[in-house]
């Protein structure tokens, strides 16, 4: 028998939940009453730090390894989360990579396929698994999915990362299409599209100074911080957004 969720708001899986926006979402979800499954691909130390933070604040969390681009890992992730924390109520599709900066004519095909595998296939596989568990059509009790997109999908990433921007464009399509597909099955599907945010993403892409350098060009005059993005995610997960589905919430300081 599956345990009842130890979080008053239910169980949420946050993919890529150990760092950056994912870590902020995981911590805030724990503070808002969710039992949190903090997924990570390789950095177990970062994921365990987030789990400890949630535990110390009085919440409940577990760290679960899994590569979201691998179908078998996705199934194992969801099974482990429900065994440890109780029935799923929400998914935050956050795991993603940039593949680094490159013009398209210099882009390595292996990099392209890896970005699409993690950012697109990974999100689709996780959303599929969530629907199978949440949909009233499959005996579920409904729930919420929030995908992490990017304003890069709107602007295209020219000269930097068209490959990354295109992968986030796919997330926007997934959000709108799936929202309509499961709207009468008790599942809301939305996305948050962050703009320039101070995370490790920029350093991983090879430009650690990118956020402070470009911040003054944003209408609000600065880059965002992960906690600001997390607030949008938690609103979309919450009953306060009960009539919102298929929305792509831009959080970009006016960009």
Predicted stretch roles:
Residues 86, 183, 188, 244-246:
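Short, small/polar-rich loop/turn modules that mediate ligand/substrate recognition or access, typified
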Residues 127, 167:
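Active-site helix of classical SDR
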Residues 132, 180-181, 242:
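Alpha-helical segment proximal to the catalytic Tyr-Lys
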Residues 150:
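Residue(s) in the substrate-gating loop at a strand-loop-helix junction
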